[in-house]
């Protein structure tokens, strides 16, 4: 089963994968940032937002994974321990870093701004070097007026806009109208 944990937030795992691996801060820095900015909301009993819930879950997963690594480290050789730690940091650790970065950024800058950044960066990175601007988009400097047009989706989510007239029907498909005859047309 292929589960995309970012789908409900209007983003996708694919968009986050456009960002280079070294883009995401160290896990300790992300955990410290989460604690410094949102400790009350994360430890409180009230449900604040889906982003807070996702951060809580990521922190719990990382804590359990750290316990497992500690237990395994005590019962293995140095070489095996290094291999395990490297593997965890490059797989699960990366996913936790991506998750924490995404949700912390959504809380800090707004979900819409983060989506704009991911799309802008994805376009920038896929554009061949000779045709793209020298500097990549930066999350904190995105203009607020940037508009993302979604493909498909529900019409209720879109802002109201003027309807474009539909193309004209061919005469054979349009209903026939009878003209009332005026007295002048009888001549």
From Swiss-Prot:
Region (3 X 8 AA repeats of S-P-R-R-R-[PR]-S-Q): 159-181
Region span, Disordered: 136-187
Gene Ontology BP term (one): symbiont entry into host cell
Sites bearing Phosphoserine, chain numbering: 159, 166, 174
GO molecular function terms attached to this record: DNA binding; RNA binding; structural molecule activity
Basic residues biased stretches: 148-180
Keyword annotations of the record: Capsid protein, Cytoplasmic inwards viral transport, DNA-binding, Host cytoplasm, Host-virus interaction, Microtubular inwards viral transport, Phosphoprotein, Repeat, RNA-binding, T=4 icosahedral capsid protein, Viral penetration into host nucleus, Virion, Virus entry into host cell
Main location: virion
Post-translational modification (record): Phosphorylated by host SRPK1, SRPK2, and maybe protein kinase C or GAPDH. Phosphorylation is critical for pregenomic RNA packaging. Protein kinase C phosphorylation is stimulated by HBx protein and may play a role in transport of the viral genome to the nucleus at the late step during the viral replication cycle.
Alphabetical list of InterPro entries matching this protein: Hepatitis_core, Viral_capsid_core_dom_sf_HBV
Gene Ontology cellular component list: host cell; host cell cytoplasm; T=4 icosahedral viral capsid
Motif Bipartite nuclear localization signal: where in chain: 162-179
Name of a matching Pfam family: Hepatitis_core
Compartments it resides in: Virion; Host cytoplasm
Segments for region (RNA binding): 181-187
Residue windows of the Sequence repeats: 159-165, 166-173, 174-181
Quaternary structure and partners: Homodimerizes, then multimerizes. Interacts with cytosol exposed regions of viral L glycoprotein present in the reticulum-to-Golgi compartment. Interacts with human FLNB. Phosphorylated form interacts with host importin alpha; this interaction depends on the exposure of the NLS, which itself depends upon genome maturation and/or phosphorylation of the capsid protein. Interacts with host NUP153.
UniProt similarity note: Belongs to the orthohepadnavirus core antigen family.
HAMAP family with a match to the protein in the record: HBV_HBEAG (MF_04076)
Function: Self assembles to form an icosahedral capsid. Most capsids appear to be large particles with an icosahedral symmetry of T=4 and consist of 240 copies of capsid protein, though a fraction forms smaller T=3 particles consisting of 180 capsid proteins. Entering capsids are transported along microtubules to the nucleus. Phosphorylation of the capsid is thought to induce exposure of nuclear localization signal in the C-terminal portion of the capsid protein that allows binding to the nuclear pore complex via the importin (karyopherin-) alpha and beta.
Name the record gives this protein: Capsid protein
Species the sequence originates in: Ground squirrel hepatitis virus (strain 27) (GSHV)
């Amino acid at each position: 089963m292929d589960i995309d944990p970012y789908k409900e937030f209007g983003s996708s795992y694919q968009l986050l994968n456009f960002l280079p691996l070294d883009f995401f801060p160290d896990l300790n820095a992300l955990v410290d940032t989460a604690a410094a900015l949102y400790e009350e909301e994360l430890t409180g009993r009230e449900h604040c937002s889906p982003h807070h819930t996702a951060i809580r879950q990521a922190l719990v997963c990382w804590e359990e994974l750290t316990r497992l690594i500690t237990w395994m480290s005590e019962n293995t050789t140095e070489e095996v321990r290094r291999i395990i730690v490297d593997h965890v940091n490059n797989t699960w650790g990366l996913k936790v870093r991506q998750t924490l970065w995404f949700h912390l950024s959504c809380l800090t800058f707004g979900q819409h701004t983060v989506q704009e950044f991911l799309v802008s960066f994805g376009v920038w990175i896929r554009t061949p070097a000779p045709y793209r601007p020298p500097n990549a988009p930066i999350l904190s400097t995105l203009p607020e007026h940037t508009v993302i047009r979604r493909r498909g989706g529900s019409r209720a989510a879109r802002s109201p806009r003027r309807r474009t007239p539909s193309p004209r029907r061919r005469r054979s498909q349009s209903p026939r109208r009878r003209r009332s005859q005026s007295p002048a047309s009888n001549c």
